[in-house]
């Protein structure tokens, strides 16, 4: 029994090697797993289900072996692809999963998150996130033409890349430990799995006088990054 967790593929036409790696992963490994969880930032940008490009089509095609095998795939929104909707998820064979979600993973309650809400020290990002996750903002954005939406996405991505390259922001772009502990206490769990930070690791710490674990998923820029449980 194995369940697979991935995140932060950032699929984009400029990185065809990542979709090729993902295609092999689905055909060679995911079809034999109990389930696949994708915890956000599957795509570099997503401006609506009515506007996906060749990469979106390639992803749907890459997922075909998983659909044919009848294996479940669960998808959680990231900060880059939070507008991915039911229509595309259905075509790809994915079930949308709220952020956060608690699952029973082989007898262990496990909290799943994308991870961006844990980066509470990055106040500028959290303010932006609150704005773009509002239902009214999304309604207005999706009502705009594709070119206008694409221009906004490009601008937001460029700004995010500048923010990431600024070394003075390195600390605030990681999770806040207090936010981690608050989320885990609220969920009544001792294991958390998330992505977003691109800092793959397994962190062990004390939570209410008992051991707890935070598993961080990596990105796929250089190679595939997969967490296999158990």
Per-range role (PLM):
Residues 42-66, 162-175, 179-192:
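N-terminal short leaders/motifs
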Residues 3-5, 36-38, 111, 193:
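Residue-level marker for buried hydrophobic side chains located in beta-strands
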Residues 2, 11-105:
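Core catalytic region of metal-dependent phosphoesterases/phosphodiesterases
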Residues 115-175:
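Active-site-proximal loop/helix segment associated with metal-binding centers of metalloenzymes
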Residues 1-2, 230:
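Short, low-complexity, intrinsically disordered N-terminal peptides in bacterial proteins
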Residues 91-98, 109-111, 116, 121-128, ...:
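Conserved beta-sheet core of the metallophosphoesterase superfamily
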Residues 46, 137, 217-220:
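Tryptophan-centered motif/residue detector
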């Amino acid at each position: 029994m194995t369940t697979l967790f991935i995140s932060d593929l950032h699929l984009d036409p400029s990185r065809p090697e990542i979709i090729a790696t993902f295609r092999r992963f689905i055909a060679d490994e995911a079809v034999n797993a109990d389930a696949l969880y994708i915890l956000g930032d599957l795509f570099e940008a997503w401006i609506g289900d009515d506007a996906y490009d060749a990469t979106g089509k390639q992803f749907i095609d890459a997922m075909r072996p998983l659909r044919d095998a009848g294996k479940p795939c669960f998808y959680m929104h990231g900060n880059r692809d939070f507008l991915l909707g039911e229509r595309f998820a259905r075509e790809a064979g994915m079930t949308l999963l709220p952020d956060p979600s608690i699952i029973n993973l082989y007898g262990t309650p496990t909290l799943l998150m994308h991870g961006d809400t844990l980066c509470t020290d990055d106040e500028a990002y959290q303010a932006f996130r609150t704005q773009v996750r509002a239902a009214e903002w999304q309604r207005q954005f999706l009502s705009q033409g594709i070119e206008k939406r694409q221009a906004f996405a490009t601008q937001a991505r460029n700004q995010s890349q500048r923010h990431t390259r600024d070394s003075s922001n390195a600390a605030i772009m990681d999770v806040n430990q207090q936010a981690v502990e608050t989320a885990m206490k609220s969920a009544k769990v001792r294991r958390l799995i998330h992505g977003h930070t691109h800092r793959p690791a397994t962190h062990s710490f004390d939570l209410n006088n008992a051991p707890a674990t935070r598993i961080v998923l990596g990105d796929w820029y250089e190679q595939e990054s997969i967490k296999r449980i158990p």
